Each structure stands twice: as C-alpha cells, then as structure tokens.
Amino acid sequence: MPPRRTNHVPNHAHARDRLTYAGSGVSIDAGDAFAASIGTLLRRTHGPRVIDNPGGFAGMLRLDYNEKLFQRNYKDPVLVACTDGVGTKVKLAIDCQKYDTVGIDLVAMSVNDLIVLGAEPLLFLDYIAVHKVEQQMLHDIVKGVSEGCRAAGCALLGGETAEMNDLYAPGDFDLAGFAVGVAELKRVTNAERVRPGDVVLGLASSGVHSNGYSLVRRIVTHAKLKLDKAYPELEGDRPLGEVLLEPTRIYAASVIKTIRSYKVKQVVTAMAHITGGGLAGNLERSIPEDCDAQIDRKAWAVPPLFRFLQKHGNVEEAEMRRVFNMGVGYCMVVRPTFADGVRKRLEKVGETVYEIGKITKGKGRVIEK
C-alpha cells in the first residue's frame, strides 16, 4: 500500500533568523502523523487486486486478465477515468463542523460519472488541500472517502494532503477526487445506442447531492435559516445542516449489478448522472441528435427539501430545475420490453425507481411536461 503523501507549502515569513517550516506555521510532523494514522481506512477498501507496495510513490492494482470471472465480463477491456470535487458543499461542512459526509460525496461524484459508461469502479485517489493539518477533521474526511469507496466497490489506493496556509484561510479546505474503472468496449453505454421507444427510468436522489450549494448557502443566509434548527416542513427532527449535508447517493453497486444481470442482450442503452444543469441538462448529453426524451414531471414527487429551499429563496421553478436534481439523481435509458424487469432488479437492491419518460424521434432535446 502506498503511503498517503502530505505536501507542505510554507508561508513566506520575513525574519533575520533561519527560516523553518515550523516557524512558517507548517508542521511536517503533524502531516506525517496523519498519514500514518489512516492506514486502516485505506486497507479496508482493498481487495485481492491491490498489490502491497510499502514505501512506494504510487499504488498498484492488478487487472486479473487470467481469472475466469474477468474473462467472462471483459473481452476487450478499456480503462475509464474521471475526476470531480464537492464544490462549496465543503463550506457548509465547515459551518456545521461536520466532515465525515463530504468524503462520501467526493467518491460519489466521480464514480457516479464513471458508471454512466457502464464501467466497474476499480480505484480512487483523493486530494485534500488545507490551511493547516488538523488531525480529527482530516481523519473524518478520509473516513468518509473510505466509506464511499467501500460502497462503490473500489480501492482507495492513495491520496495527497497539501498544507497551504498562504492559499487557504484558517479552517478552510478543498477536495478533489479521481476514479478509474474498467468497461467492456462493445458494451459501453452511450447516446449511440438509444432508440425511439426506449424508456427513461429515474433513480431517486438522497437529497441535494453535491451541486447547487452556492445557491443553497445564499438561501440560508438570505432567509436567515438556522443550520442547527429542525424545520417541520422537512418532515423530520434532523437539523437543517444535517439534512443539507446528507451524502450523495452512490449508484455504482446497484447499477453495475443490474447491467451485468443481462449477460447477452444490452438492455440499458444510456445513462446520465444528474448533477449541475439538472435533469434536462444532463440527460440530453446521453441521447442522440435525432431523438428527444419526453419527461413526465408528475411521475415522481419532488422531495420537501427542494420546495423548502424554493420557498425560502423565492427561486423560480425553471431555476430550481436547472440547478438541482429535484429528487432524481440518476437516469437509465432502457429497451421498453425490459423496463419493468430493470426497475424490479434495481428495487431489489435498494433503489427507489420511477418510470419518468420515453424516447421519441426529435432533435436531441429533453422536454419536461
């Protein structure tokens, strides 16, 4: 297992004495202690594909070409990679002093993009930039990353912690994640496979996920909402901050399992991760130019949280749908004769699924009615 690296960028202080990292407010010892403390969090995500490499500068993962299971799933395997962050949701985590969920978000944002192509997540790397190494905060973040990797079925192979007190204010941090997966080239899901008559299934989101938090935080400030207060409109006794920090749902395990249950026919033709841009802005990336996706807005109930935000921010409906997922976090386009079977398989593994529309001849548009 490669060690987690901690990079220290000092604050340049003017002094007549010899300068040191410690004198510049940067602790090498604290960074090394943190890196040493999280080995268990990394190892619990590792399977037999991970090759132990003590003291290495990079991680290694074996593609088990000679294993029968791998040969059954992959004849022409291709690597798939993507990267993403959590955006200003980290500011909300800072305000609430709750850091364990944004690590899950970090994994979700990348692996949910990865599986759009039908790729099996293999490994994940994280990058954490901080003002100062704070052991408990960083431990909570990486704990969330570890939990996210376990949910996605991929290995947390390593990471970087950059201490930069010149760039970040005290208490501030930022996150970036990088995911790599493998897909069978002939079974990659994309717009080219979509046909008129295909059915659009929507998988329920767990909340706001990780997009639109600049607007969310503006609403909280504008309406003078209290993050530590429970609001009856949200149908629960959890404080608002906790509701807003609900981690992004990771769809990897259920989606990949469902796709693989159809060993011969490719019944899932395209997919979309619903992030910034809303359902229309993301689904249109997964349909061809000669087709439209006709979406029935009445096919699912918009969760109370979105109406709560809309009310307190006086946000127009069109803006809400352009910014937020509105209760649908992932879409799958499937052949019509298999739509009911795919829905039942997804529900069996814990997803809430709505039949939200169909594909028709058109001009590459998503039409919401």
Task: Give names to the regions the model predicted.
Residues 2-5, 16-23, 40, 137-155, ...:
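Glycine-/charge-enriched secondary-structure boundary and capping motifs
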